[in-house]
Design a protein with these regions (language model features):
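Alpha-helical recognition segments enriched in aromatics with Gly/Pro capping
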Residues: 1, 31-32, 53-267
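N-terminal, positively charged nucleic-acid-binding surface of large information/translation enzymes
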Residues: 1-38, 389-392
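Residue-level preference for long, well-ordered alpha-helices that form the structural scaffold
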Residues: 15, 19-23, 51, 248, ...
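Aromatic- and histidine-enriched alpha-helix N-cap/loop-to-helix transition segments
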Residues: 50, 143-147, 294, 298-301
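Structural preference for alpha-helix termini/caps and helix-kink/transition segments
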Residues: 205-206, 212-396
Length: 396
């Protein structure tokens, strides 16, 4: 958690809050959203403000090795000293036309040797208020890029397997992370990079001015739930832009209803057909999709193909259990709460009504059967007549 940077300092002062109070509010909101989406909590959650002394030590190492220099109380990384700078995005040194931090120079950056050098340590200014730490270069605070490199290498070591982030962070942020980390340690920083594409709304970039800016809370307040939002997000490959629409959420809701109905049918199955072969084929297709650049959308397609195949048959109890185990295994990856889908308990009066309707249907007394159906619908119970008998669910 980068709980100290230009934006958090600026916005906390604007709201008249301490940096700690301001960032803790948004940290709590972030984890509330994670819970709503059924995201597992990380093993370690680090805050930049807890690592400032380690960052100062990291910057000193870069200065001592000749990769960084001090100007007017700030410390900058000398890009020209790191020959592999830009390798993540395929840049050559002659391609550097602008400042590597991707912004115009701030007032405290006029002393840089080269316009493309980026700040490792920023000297204190009046705009920082009471946010500063003492360092060998005077009062100041860490730059944004150094925070991530120091925290990740502290918990994972100088080299780790996978570094994730939005596609917009490839340059300059991740590029700068690689440069400062590898210059300091002399080792490869991350073996693999996982860059996630943007989410757009109704085919356009999200923006408050366009009136199409939505948070997860906005979606939940419109009556959708985190499970539906999660499924929608899973449905697009991470390398592809996700076009968010409320029509898409409605379709997702119906898809999840079909999945739940499928699971309930399996739990009650007692037919003649062996569907264990379909389960084995689906497991293979699901795993192959995941091994193909984490193709979750392909894995979902494998699950739906399984549903289509099984729904054409009347599964035996034993093979239905096999299919359930397979789908629950899928859910260990998907996190859609499928193991929690159970038939709710009905009170005796409702159960009696369902049995009465079944008797009426056997006698071909359709008028009575329809009357009971409508009566139960008024109580929030929706009936479904299937080849395996009458099933029910709570109406939306």
């Amino acid at each position: 958690l980068t709980d100290v940077d230009d934006k958090t300092i600026r916005d906390s002062r604007k709201e008249g809050k301490t940096l700690k109070d301001f960032t803790e509010y948004y940290t709590e909101a972030f984890f509330n959203d994670c819970d709503a989406l059924n995201l597992e909590r990380p093993e370690h959650v680090t805050k930049a403000t807890d690592y400032v002394q380690a960052m100062i030590g990291f910057v000193k190492t870069l200065v001592d090795k000749g990769y960084a220099y001090e100007r007017n109380g700030s410390v900058y990384f000398a890009i020209e000293k790191f020959q592999e700078y830009g390798k993540l995005v395929g840049l050559e040194h002659q391609d550097f036309k602008t400042n590597a931090d991707g912004r115009l120079q701030d007032a405290d950056e006029y002393g840089k040797e080269h316009v493309r050098d980026f700040a490792l340590w920023k000297a204190w200014t009046e705009d920082d208020g009471d946010v500063y730490w003492d360092s060998p270069w005077g009062k100041g605070r860490p730059g944004w890029h150094i925070e991530c490199s120091v925290m990740s290498t502290d918990k994972l070591g100088p080299t780790f397997d996978l570094h994730a982030g939005g596609v917009d962070l490839k340059f300059p942020h991740h590029t700068n992370e690689i440069a400062q980390a590898e210059a300091a340690t002399g080792e490869e920083f991350a073996k693999h990079w996982f860059h996630v594409e943007h989410l757009i709304v109704e085919g356009e970039k999200m923006s408050k001015s366009a009136g199409n800016f939505y948070t997860l809370r906005d979606v939940l307040e419109k009556g959708y739930n985190g499970r539906e939002a999660r499924y929608l997000l899973l449905g697009t490959h991470y390398r592809s832009m996700l076009n968010f629409t409320f029509e898409g959420l409605e379709a997702t809701r119906k898809t999840l209803e079909r999945i739940d109905d499928f699971l309930l049918r399996l739990q009650e199955a007692d037919g003649p057909d062996d569907v264990s072969g379909e389960a084995e084929q689906a497991e293979k297709a699901f795993d192959e999709a995941l091994e193909d650049d984490l193709n979750i959308s392909g894995a979902l397609a494998a699950m739906h193909e399984l549903m289509r195949g099984v729904n054409k048959k009347q599964p035996s109890k034993e093979s239905a259990r096999k299919v359930l185990e397979t789908v629950y295994g899928f859910d260990d990856v998907l996190g859609l709460g499928m193991k929690d889908v159970k038939r709710g308990s009905l009170d005796e009066k409702v159960e009696k009504k369902i049995k009465e309707r079944e008797e009426a249907r056997k006698k071909k007394d359709w008028a009575t059967a329809d009357k009971i159906r409508d009566e139960l619908k008024g109580q929030g119970i929706e009936l479904m007549d299937t080849p395996d008998g009458t099933r029910w669910k709570k109406a939306k």
